[in-house]
Amino acid sequence: MALTTINGIELAEKFQPILDEIYKKESLTARLDGLSKPVDHNDARTVYVYKTSMVGLGDYDRATGFAAGNVTGVWEALELTKDRGRAFSVDAMSDEETLGMAFGTLVGEFIRTKVVPELDAYRFATYAGKASGKPTAAALTTSSGVLTAIDLAQKTLDGKEVPREGRVLYASEDIYYLLKGALTRTWVSDGTVDRNIERLDGMDVVMVPQTRFYEGIDLINGSDPSTGGYGQTSGKKKLNFLLLHPSAVLQIAKHNPLRVFAPDLNQTADAWLFQYRIYHDAFVYDNKTDSVYVHRYTS
């Protein structure tokens, strides 16, 4: 196919679903997306969520009837405060197949190695910052110590009547491997043994690279083309583990449609120009902070 016949709009539409699929597959927090079903507004950066407030039962009086009580429901507007993006250039190619291979490799790796880790890190830091359960930071260096700390986290959520079903335990790689050492395994008939931990006490267990697992991160503005992404906030600690119930959090990620410009429209280089942009944010509901528990490392 001649270069002049490659349609930029069609190319963008072709790759958009692929980018979305990579995000869903690679993100450790994607499982929490959209569980609260917010209602979108015309403004792409605003979503509405329904918040309720109510009191418990009162005595029924045969003379006066039902006890009055405040039960209210309101729509609250939440603004997505993170507006991130990046432009890519791919040298001019003579045919669509070669262009597609180059672009797919470039953007696929960008989503996997840059976008997904940043989204996960931002969400974990947000949830850690809002967690009601937050014991004194400590190093967990033994398998028994890890189990004791996780038991305390579960007990804390139990005491707040947080539902047991559906809880998710996110653990740093150090904690995850200590946890593996605390549990015994049995050889199966074919002589293999699977030591991976996917569930513990009814909770899904997800291992998180420490590079995504902090109680605070700084987003780099990227004004310098050689810099971007995020880093651990000075004074904020690494996380050992984070236990939460998905109903306590809301996270939104809006991947704006890709913009693609052919070389003859690119004013800076003889190259295809691709622009990627995403609005996103994460929230913990004010009345559900008890459903989030974080254990921090000492540094």
Q: Which residues fall in each region the model found?
A:
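Extended, solvent-exposed, turn-rich assembly/linker loops in the middle of proteins
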Residues: 131-200
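Long, contiguous amphipathic alpha-helices that act as assembly "spine/axial" helices in icosahedral shell
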Residues: 49-51, 73-135, 145, 158-173, ...
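Sequence/fold signature of self-assembling virion shell proteins
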Residues: 2-56, 73-81, 87, 98, ...
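Charged, low-complexity surface segments at secondary-structure and domain boundaries
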Residues: 1-6, 91-92, 132-140
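Active-site-surrounding "flap" and adjacent substrate/cofactor-binding loops of secreted or lumenal enzymes
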Residues: 65-66, 71-74
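Residue-level detector of alpha-helical recognition elements and their boundaries
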Residues: 64, 125-126, 130, 220, ...
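Generic structural signal of hydrophobic/aromatic residues within well-ordered alpha-helices
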Residues: 15-23, 119, 123-127, 153, ...
